[in-house]
Amino acid sequence: IKIKTDGYIGYIVKKKFASKFKATHKVSVLKANTYKKPIIKTKQQKKLTFNSKILAKERNGLFIKFENCWIKTKDLKPINYKYKNIFSKIKIFKEVKYKWGGKSFNGLDCSALLQIFYNFNNRFCPRDTLEQRKFFKKKIKLKNINRNDLIFWKGHVAIALSKNTLVHAYGPLKKVVIMNIFKTIKRIENTAKLKVIGVRRI
């Protein structure tokens, strides 16, 4: 199979492969509970992560049915919904653990944090930092950094929340954190011996 959002090619057991469907909604919260019935007390262990896609089959009050489960309508957005500010909800991932290769509430890495918000807005973004740095072509100087700009190191990326703060899935702290931009640059230079190699405007 080929992953649409990444372009990666891999293999999956055929019987576990879902038939093609046209999604109608996507999860807009960090993790959404599912229910056996459209009743709160029937909550299941299964949860859906941010940007999971579903095909709605039925609506019942405050719930929508998909497959053999129900999910709260308030945890969903229509499939074509886009945030005006692409990273406006990025803080929902604050404190989520760092996990290399992860892309969910169970853990994610720095490049995934960037990619999933692009994917939520129905836009393509490469999976790896090297390709992301090439993909975003508008170069700016660090002194001109502002909200939503991207800061790249070798193998790492952070997203500016303002002129002074950034958010990133940071391996050494093992979680998604909000930090001062210039203290972070100094810290990474001192600990990992890495300098900023690019700043991009999306």
PLM feature segments, named:
Residues L48-I54, I145-N148:
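Loop/turn positions that initiate beta-strands
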Residues T34-Q44, R133-L142:
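Short alpha-helix capping/helix-loop boundary micro-motifs
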Residues F21-K36, I116-R133:
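Short, basic/aromatic beta-hairpin or loop at an interaction surface
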Residues I90, G102-N121, C125-P126:
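Active-site nucleophilic cysteine motif
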Residues V13, K72-K74, D109, I178-K183:
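Helix N-cap / beta->alpha transition motif
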Residues E189-I202:
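Low-complexity, Gly/Ser/Thr/Pro-rich intrinsically disordered linker/tail segments
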Residues K2-N33, K37-T42, S52-V96:
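Boundary regions of SH3-family modules and the immediately adjacent low-complexity/disordered segments
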Residues R123-F182:
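...with weaker cross-activation on analogous glycine-rich loops/strands in unrelated enzymes
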